[in-house]
Structures are given as structure tokens and as C-alpha cells.
């Protein structure tokens, strides 16, 4: 199936006046500030030079975690495949690194590019940590599990299982025909259960779409990805990258401040229904 619009296409709009990050429903100013574990406070030596616009060198040690592969670099963070030498397992390690606001200066240390970016950088950092703390509190097979998180080197890190699989968009494109009812039920039941878990804590995803659902290799169980709390906080504060929406999956209340409309659990339900539309028809729904 070939959809009429790539799911990675997003619309960038100005946030509503007074908008706050509600991806994770807590006060983003109340961040976790416990000191990093002793093993992480003094990382092992690394290469003498680190490129300011790239990830850390392969082989870098952050306590018991050794970076073995650069998985992805985005506008707000870097993800590495890593080895946990304490528990002898592969993990994914995510580093908060908003490239438009921060840089490295030849070391592991992350610093803001300019003092005028500091407030925005720190707000995103707090949101990143709070998201990690919230995800660490959840226990559902269709939600990303965070093993641990900490602050060091002027930034923050979170460690998660290394999940393997394809996103839902690519999975659907590989099917010889549209999925049947049983396939859709198998997809939807775990996702609706996962949403019940996060909604019970007044947490809203706000970015559900086919490319934010991974179908895990082997089990084909769906996994909900990318809460993106730091991205939205930075967008709200800069009003440049602003709130990022995927047309067709975002309900009308996400586009602007409309009297009588607010975001909530129903925002995610709309997006999930739009995902079902895509799965059945192979086409992105019309924008709300």
C-alpha cells in the first residue's frame, strides 16, 4: 500500500497562548535533581575530540554503559546502542542534546551555544528528565520501559531496552493486502490498554501515528514510541519549532486555542482512530 502522504510529514504551527507542555501531565519545572550514581559521576576517559554536531565516539563509557553504535541523531537528542557491562545486556541510551541550542566543546560536556538559549535548554532538560521518570514508573508491554536516568556532563541520559522491529507504517506497506479484523484487534488491544495506563496518570501522548508505533520483531506486539516531551517544551518556548503536528492524525484542538476545546485522553483516541483508518485504507485521513 502506498499512502497519499508520508507519515513523517509534520505541520509546524504556533502554540496556543500560554501553552504548556502537557505531553506528560506534570509541572515541567519540578524536575528530578538527585545526583547521578557514583559510577556515572566520573565517566571513563573518552577520545580527546568530540565533534560538536555529532554523537559521542563509539567506545565512550558512561559508568557501566559502553556506547557501541550510533542509532540515530535528531534535533533534540541522540540515541546509542550500548552495552550494560553490569547486567551483560544490550540497551538503548538516549542523550538529551538539542542541536539548535547546545554544543560540545571537544569533550563530553554539553553547553548552551548562547546565554539567550539557557532558559529554553534547561526547560527542555527538566522535561526530558520528568518524562524519563514517568516512563520508568509505567509497566506495560506496549509502553517503552526506562531502566534508569541521570544528569551528568551538563545534560541528561535515559537507558531503555533496545527494541527491534519495524514501525507500523512500514509493516502495513509490507502486507500483501489490507489487514483483516483479527489483525486490527491484535494491534488495537495492547495500544488501548497502554493508553489506559498513561491516561490514568493524566499523561497524554499527543503524537500517535503509524511511524510512532513499532511492531516488535518476533512477537509483532505494538510498542508506543516517542512521547517527545522535551521537543514540545522547547517548541512552546521558542515559538520557532513550535508544536509539531502530523496532519490527519492530530485532532482540531491541537491546531489552535479554541474556546471550549482542550486536549486530553480524547486527543489520543482520535489519533489512534486515525491510525486505524490508515491501516484499513492505506491513506492518511484528511486533516481535522
Language-model features and meaning:
Residues 68-75, 79:
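Protein kinase glycine-rich loop
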Residues 187-188:
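Activation segment signature within eukaryotic-like protein kinase domains
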Residues 149:
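Activation-segment/catalytic-loop signature of the eukaryotic protein kinase fold
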Residues 153-167, 171:
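Conserved short submotifs of the Hanks-type protein kinase catalytic core
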Residues 191-203:
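Protein kinase catalytic-loop region centered on the HRD/HxD motif
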Residues 240-254:
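Conserved activation segment of eukaryotic-like protein kinases, specifically the C-terminal portion
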Residues 103-137:
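AlphaC helix of the eukaryotic protein kinase fold
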Amino acid at each position: 500500500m502506498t499512502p497519499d502522504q508520508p507519515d513523517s510529514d509534520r505541520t509546524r504551527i504556533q502554540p496556543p497562548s500560554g501553552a504548556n507542555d502537557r505531553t506528560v501531565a506534570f509541572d515541567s519545572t519540578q524536575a528530578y535533581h538527585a545526583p547521578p550514581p557514583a559510577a556515572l559521576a566520573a565517566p571513563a576517559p573518552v577520545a580527546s575530540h568530540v565533534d560538536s554536531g555529532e554523537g559521542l565516539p563509539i567506545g565512550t563509557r558512561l559508568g557501566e554503559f559502553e556506547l557501541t553504535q550510533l542509532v540515530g541523531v535528531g534535533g533534540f537528542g541522540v540515541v546509542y546502542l550500548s552495552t550494560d557491562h553490569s547486567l551483560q545486556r544490550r540497551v538503548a541510551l538516549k542523550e538529551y542534546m538539542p542541536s539548535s541550542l547546545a554544543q560540545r566543546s571537544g569533550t563530553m560536556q554539553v553547553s548552551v551555544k548562547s546565554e539567550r538559549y539557557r532558559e529554553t535548554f534547561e526547560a527542555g532538560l527538566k522535561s526530558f528528565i520528568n518524562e524519563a521518570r514517568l516512563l520508568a514508573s509505567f509497566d506495560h508491554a506496549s509502553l517503552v520501559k526506562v531502566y534508569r536516568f541521570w544528569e551528568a556532563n551538563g545534560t541528561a541520559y535515559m537507558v531503555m531496552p533496545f527494541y527491534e522491529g519495524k514501525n507500523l507504517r512500514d509493516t502495513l506497506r509490507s502486507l500483501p493486502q489490507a489487514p483483516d479484523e483479527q489483525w486490527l484487534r491484535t494491534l488495537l488491544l495492547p495500544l488501548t490498554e497502554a493508553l489506559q495506563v498513561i491516561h490514568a496518570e493524566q499523561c497524554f501522548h499527543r503524537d500517535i501515528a503509524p511511524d510512532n508505533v513499532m511492531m516488535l520483531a518476533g512477537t509483532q506486539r505494538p510498542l508506543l514510541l516517542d512521547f517527545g516531551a522535551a521537543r514540545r517544551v522547547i517548541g512552546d518556548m521558542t515559538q520557532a519549532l513550535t508544536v509539531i503536528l502530523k496532519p490527519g492524525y492530530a485532532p482540531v484542538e491541537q491546531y489552535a486555542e479554541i474556546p471550549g476545546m482542550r486536549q486530553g485522553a480524547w486527543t489520543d483516541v482520535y489519533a489512534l482512530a486515525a491510525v486505524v483508518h490508515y491501516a484499513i485504507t492505506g491513506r492518511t485521513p484528511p486533516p481535522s
